[in-house]
């Protein structure tokens, strides 16, 4: 199906689409399109559609239909009738939300199923597209330790390969592991650590609605200069439950040398690397009083040129994972020999996971 804005008719990206009463879901792509692959024995009767700044929608489905479903979402016209006074300390709200992570998030070992995609663009042309179905084993959020969280690639495929004529091969290191490393709530080393908070200043922005629930929106940016590049962005926190529901952050690009260190793994001799952007989007979803990881996207933009050449070339590398299913209280862990390593390159290994029936089962 496709999801569009009811007022301006534009397609909506990153809209949550889930089967009502289940853990099965996905998000829309850049064209507003989505697809849910569901077993015949589990034919859904209703879909839940939600997006930041829009009214939640529930769609009833016929028994069988092959028609393309179009869903129209209505923007929230500011539903705050009362005047909101930002009397609370934003740093204090963030600290309270951190303290409530063990209560608000899963207290069991869960096994997530995720759909992963990484793309490489040279200018506007796609030169590489790879996809995978992942298992992500997560321990409880009570101790916020990711050392025992692992990712296993179940199957993969390469839709578009980089050509020999491309003068530069661009690859992502450890890409499928973003379901572990970029789970900002679980991985306190990413941002949400009390000591790390001292490096930032926080201030309130206008409140927003997500899933028909009011959110604190708190901006943050660096207030100190360190040896490494810091982040800036927005934290969305459920006002009632004090759970993190959405995190938008980008790497500070003021010092290009620090930014390069954070982004670049290795490059050919004689290539000049110019970082432009490193941004992250992480969303979480409330299900029956607990909040779970839902979607992660990592976008890197940079320019490259070779010494003695006049013109540079722009590249955009995007990695994303959407959680499509979740099993709670799973005791099984992914064996180390089956886990995808942080220093492995999925593009190079995708043929090992090739499955002609990629969308089957």
Locate each region found by the language model.
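Hydrophobic beta-strand segments
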Residues: 15-19, 32, 47, 85
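A short, solvent-exposed loop/turn motif at the edges and junctions
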Residues: 19, 46-59
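Surface-exposed, low-complexity/disordered segments
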Residues: 70-200, 211-214, 260-264, 268-361
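Structured interaction patches on ligand/partner-binding surfaces of diverse proteins
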Residues: 26, 55-68
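Extended beta-strand-rich segments in extracellular/periplasmic secretory proteins, especially
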Residues: 185-239, 243-251, 282-286, 291
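Structural motif
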Residues: 1-12
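Short strand-edge motifs at loop-to-beta-strand transitions and within beta-strands
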Residues: 34-36, 67-69
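Short, acidic Ser/Thr/Gly-rich low-complexity loop/linker segments typical of extracellular
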Residues: 23-33
